[in-house]
Amino acid sequence: MRIGKSSGWLNESVSLEYEHVSPPTRPRDTRRRPRAAGDGGLAHLHRRLAVGYAEDTPRTEARSPAPRRPLPVAPASAPPAPSLVPEPPMPVSLPAVSSPRFSAGSSAAITDPFPSLPPTPVLYAMARELEALSDATWQPAVPLPAEPPTDARRGNTVFDEASASSPVIASACPQAFASPPRAPRSARARRARTGGDAWPAPTFLSRPSSSRIGRDVFGKLVALGYSREQIRKLKQESLSEIAKYHTTLTGQGFTHADICRISRRRQSLRVVARNYPELAAALPELTRAHIVDIARQRSGDLALQALLPVATALTAAPLRLSASQIATVAQYGERPAIQALYRLRRKLTRAPLHLTPQQVVAIASNTGGKRALEAVCVQLPVLRAAPYRLSTEQVVAIASNKGGKQALEAVKAHLLDLLGAPYVLDTEQVVAIASHNGGKQALEAVKADLLDLRGAPYALSTEQVVAIASHNGGKQALEAVKADLLELRGAPYALSTEQVVAIASHNGGKQALEAVKAHLLDLRGVPYALSTEQVVAIASHNGGKQALEAVKAQLLDLRGAPYALSTAQVVAIASNGGGKQALEGIGEQLLKLRTAPYGLSTEQVVAIASHDGGKQALEAVGAQLVALRAAPYALSTEQVVAIASNKGGKQALEAVKAQLLELRGAPYALSTAQVVAIASHDGGNQALEAVGTQLVALRAAPYALSTEQVVAIASHDGGKQALEAVGAQLVALRAAPYALNTEQVVAIASSHGGKQALEAVRALFPDLRAAPYALSTAQLVAIASNPGGKQALEAVRALFRELRAAPYALSTEQVVAIASNHGGKQALEAVRALFRGLRAAPYGLSTAQVVAIASSNGGKQALEAVWALLPVLRATPYDLNTAQIVAIASHDGGKPALEAVWAKLPVLRGAPYALSTAQVVAIACISGQQALEAIEAHMPTLRQASHSLSPERVAAIACIGGRSAVEAVRQGLPVKAIRRIRREKAPVAGPPPASLGPTPQELVAVLHFFRAHQQPRQAFVDALAAFQATRPALLRLLSSVGVTEIEALGGTIPDATERWQRLLGRLGFRPATGAAAPSPDSLQGFAQSLERTLGSPGMAGQSACSPHRKRPAETAIAPRSIRRSPNNAGQPSEPWPDQLAWLQRRKRTARSHIRADSAASVPANLHLGTRAQFTPDRLRAEPGPIMQAHTSPASVSFGSHVAFEPGLPDPGTPTSADLASFEAEPFGVGPLDFHLDWLLQILET
């Protein structure tokens, strides 16, 4: 067998062994020699065993030779031994046998060193040759005798194949080897022998010189620019390959990090070095990152080799795959999937399969992709037909996972059984279970365990069982729930069934349950002091087990110096996929990112880390923040943080850096704010790529979208898929029978899950427009224009007739109102489940109240909270009435708000808070749970002498801006500096603000009135009458707390956080993204910046002369207000003041006059866009135009005869132009200045 031959993995391994041998020990003879007889695939193993290769043999410094018999001694008169010269020919018939005596574990090689053969110079040369080979293997030394074994049967000396391949042994057998013998270069000096010398004692192989060889390779890699950390992580067998191909790969543009990643599959180094030019020519869009991701896989070299001849065909018809799609298949499906994709490409895209390229790629991009593609070809026609009736999308979802072929077969075998009694699953549930890795086993587990888990003592619902099984490892999770549920529900754990299900309903659910069982008691005790809810939140994600263990190990350190994180912050970081790694990233990066040149706040760092992939996002911010803040990018710190604070934040930052300059130039002409808005969502990287490839096409015929519309579609989770869906569906949806306008299509697509919502509208539109549903186009668009719109439409189709009939008797508008929110499907199901119970004793709610609670984001959870807490809150010590409870629950976040009132009301009514029940209810209704928590945390400090705020002012601040406002005041909002600058630079003659503005109590009353009103359309008119106010005065009051005119007229009060952001914008300050409130340093820096800016000459005149000067909007897409449900709870229980002192000075003399005036300015047909037609009474199917409003300083921008199309964002949602005007001149002297001064007076401490 030849050494150094380059064909085949076997001989490459031999040559790689020589790469580790330094020149003094490298054998001289490397010429090609003919292959010896019997040199087969096992010769490599024989050779390694012959030289002492043993996988698990420990390295030792020295070996003590065992006792052995003495060798014959040559007579003294014998002539001196000659140098290495060929001996007389040995017998030709040398069997190639690997004797056990040469194996690493044989002791016979030591104790019986073949005394039948006298030692010869050839044998000693053989020993030195074998010793050199042993050095090259980097393996522990094994004693080897200097004499070969003897075949007792033939009397011949035995040589194995490894010995036969040696040039020394070959020299002893010239008949057996064609090449002439060559003496090797000796690795050690030999002393001159005298005539009386005997042959030296038998030689044992010494320990390989691995330290010397390691130093040589290490030094070479260091010289090539690799860091010590990179070298430490490399595999030993890859070192020489890296050194060999480094120059070639770096010349092709690969970095040191790229080469290290490729070396995980060392064979890929050679393939990439040799074939990169051909790959780049065949796939010009294939990036080096794609190649690295493919090459580092288990068989990446084979995938690259398979890709090269078929790449051009895959980019052509019928698939027309992009380079990234081909790379995805090669990375995950490897060579078999690439070959199957090429072979089946026409069959998959033609009749009867008609798969799209995206579907084909999804199927092929998994382990077992080849088998899945073949199975789809066979099974898809069958599963689409009766009796299965699966859609193509469902079949693709099942096949697009590891084990997709087996999952398809399992669905075919079990679907009909699971749809029937006693299981009664629906098709979607079966598909959900099967659409994960291990789907076959999960289906079998559901079939085996569902009936047991639905019965006593488990009492799980079908939905809960399906949720547990619908993840990777679903079978094991079901088994764990069955084994541990009863124990976890009992003492000392005391978990609820819902909490156990939440923990188990993720990848690795079984391990997460075991971790909760092991660590819950410790984490609830000292010194951790976590609540049960916090432990459950940490465990309820992929990798929950590891996250719990990391919290237990690091919580105490992170709460102490120098990190100083709160327990809530640590929990927030850990409560995501990859929470363990995110905590490690915080420990490594927090101190660095808080110092120069980064200057991030702790809250910003926590916000970045509190997402899936948080560790990588932190590292990316550390690497790129400084560059992105500098020219030519010129991003602000807040924008960088906003981009990084999402799933895939690292990739989004890299995409912004790569594409920002291009997207700001022609032909895209996007603003920096628009690019940031697109990137600041989950999947921002893909969304930016989609905008770059589709913007120009979508702006042209036949789509004719505006740039703002394209940005609006892309600025959500799944923006890439939504853009693709608009490109595919827009033309069809604008035509008959759908007849949607472009704005309606954009509204549907501009939500999370927009792609699926568009597809659902196209599929369900004809059915829902016809009897018995008879929904209008506007109602369908309203349902679909929310996250989860597809599921909401399907739920309406499934539950509509039941909810319209007794005992529910809901109107069509009420059903649509419930479905037209986040989680509309779940809200409809909750109404069906809880309606009769809530209408009966002891609850006694009206139908309108049940609908009002369900008609908000999170309606299901709010209904469940009312079911659990209403009896408790009506009893002592709470003593709330039903109307107050319904008012709190009838808003987004109703469940946590109710729970916060239940937990904190007794505390907040006592010292040192001294709040009334009405104030607590108002804060919970207006600003929610977080505001109550902020008051509990900060009010004792705000009541002290350093702030001296009364309870009424604290309550007003909480209603104005929620938690953010309370924390900003607590940290030191620079109100005095702002007011002083305003007095110096923009003096206004007139009465002081205290004589013009309402009291804090009156402000809270007005906001609560709007939030608790049953008919938002009528709220403004009723407020004019209730508070005896003029229209301009009420508008100015609402404007002073961040409500735009159009929102006020529609009765839509945005949530406190959004209003606070607007108010800070009017003051000229934008808090850092991701932070709960501005930090003291940033606030003081803001005040100093204001003083420097306004201290310049001419600023006062500029302010006075241009009170309405607009500044550019921050983004083309205004933040959408939280849309109010049309069915809100009843009036507040506390008596409202008949009139307010500040309004009394401006009130009309006759209440009827007020009614007439308001009727003219706010007509009965004022609609809130998609929400208008959902009011239970007095609603039309189609909205009409808004009549001309009174002309007044506060309403001039509210033009006449403005028609709002159905299915668009609410007219209660201000446009970017509205917000720009609202925040136009922070320090002007316009009509709102008095009320801005009044706001500053309330905030001043």
From Swiss-Prot:
Domain of life of the organism encoding this protein: Bacteria
UniProt keyword annotation of Transcription present: yes
Protein source organism: Ralstonia nicotianae (strain ATCC BAA-1114 / GMI1000)
GO CC annotation, single: extracellular region
Motif Nuclear localization signal 2 mapped to chain: 980-983
Protein name: TAL effector protein Brg11
Residue windows of the Core repeat repeats: 355-389, 390-424, 425-459, 460-494, 495-529, 530-564, 565-599, 600-634, 635-669, 670-704, 705-739, 740-774, 775-809, 810-844, 845-879, 880-914
UniProt record similarity statement: Belongs to the transcription activator-like effector (TALE) family. RipTAL/RTL subfamily.
Cryptic repeat - repeat segments: 286-320
Phenotype reported upon loss of the gene: No alteration in pathogenicity on tomato (S.lycopersicum cv Supermarmande), another study found decreased pathogenicity on eggplant (S.melongena cv. Zebrina, PubMed:20687809).
Biased composition (Pro residues): 67-87
Annotated region (Disordered), positions in chain: 1-87, 173-205, 1096-1138
UniProt-annotated location(s): Secreted; Host nucleus
Keywords, ordered alphabetically: DNA-binding, Host nucleus, Repeat, Secreted, Transcription, Transcription regulation
